[in-house]
Amino acid sequence: MYDISGWKHVFKLDPNKELSDEHLEMICESGTDAVIVGGSDGVTIDNVLHMLVSIRRYAVPCVLEVSNVEAITPGFDFYYIPSVLNSRKVEWVTGVHHEALKEFGDIMDWDEIFMEGYCVLNPEAKVAQLTDAKCDVTEDDVIAYARLADKLLRLPIFYLEYSGTYGDVELVKNVKAQLKQAKLYYGGGISNAEQAKEMAQHADTVVVGNIIYDDIKAALKTVKAVKGE
């Protein structure tokens, strides 16, 4: 079994986006610590299975970040369950999770499941609109969400999600200083190695996503930038 606490760099692949076999191989053989499969819309059992089968040709750990209960399938190493802490809708905090546990609770392998406390900070992002996230927040608000995840809920992951725009480095630094046991994931807007390296100075794990589809070479360079190799 893999130890997620040591992951510094992960790629996130959207099953609803096209990725050539050649580029998928580059991603999986890049030296990244893991590949997360997940997206905000268009996630189906068919495209998740296609992605799983494709990734399983390689040795890299793979994680399903669950956004659609109907698209859950066995075969992933881990399952990340996001709870959007700054959502205005309870369904995205605990509601969907409650329904899933009613249906699948008896067959879930809890050693494979990790809850993520999300704080979504880009109001233009699909995930913000889908979950009705309250993005007009102060640094004190974000730190309070971090403490909620880390100290009250004891979640293993606190995820700062800027999704599509590069985040506030000073905020990321200050959030990291508040966390005692939760790992800080950062995702959003990383388009080059320099940005990846900058965020890696503060976040435990840097998530690289959209740039995969825009500039594969730039995406691959983020691995060494983050891991210092």
Swiss-Prot record:
Residues the entry annotates as binding Mg(2+): D14, S40
Origin organism lineage: Bacteria, Bacillati, Bacillota, Bacilli, Bacillales
Pathway, per record: Membrane lipid metabolism; glycerophospholipid metabolism
Function recorded in the entry: Prenyltransferase that catalyzes in vivo the transfer of the heptaprenyl moiety of heptaprenyl pyrophosphate (HepPP; 35 carbon atoms) to the C3 hydroxyl of sn-glycerol-1-phosphate (G1P), producing heptaprenylglyceryl phosphate (HepGP). This reaction is an ether-bond-formation step in the biosynthesis of archaea-type G1P-based membrane lipids found in Bacillales.
HAMAP family from the UniProt entry: GGGP_HepGP_synthase
EC number annotated for this UniProt entry: 2.5.1.n9
Cofactor: Mg(2+)
Assembly and binders: Homodimer.
Catalytic activity: sn-glycerol 1-phosphate + all-trans-heptaprenyl diphosphate = 3-heptaprenyl-sn-glycero-1-phosphate + diphosphate
Gene: pcrB
Listed SUPFAM superfamilies: FMN-linked oxidoreductases
Family: Belongs to the GGGP/HepGP synthase family. Group I subfamily.
This protein's UniProt keywords: Lipid biosynthesis, Lipid metabolism, Magnesium, Metal-binding, Phospholipid biosynthesis, Phospholipid metabolism, Transferase
Single GO MF annotation: magnesium ion binding
Stated name of the protein: Heptaprenylglyceryl phosphate synthase
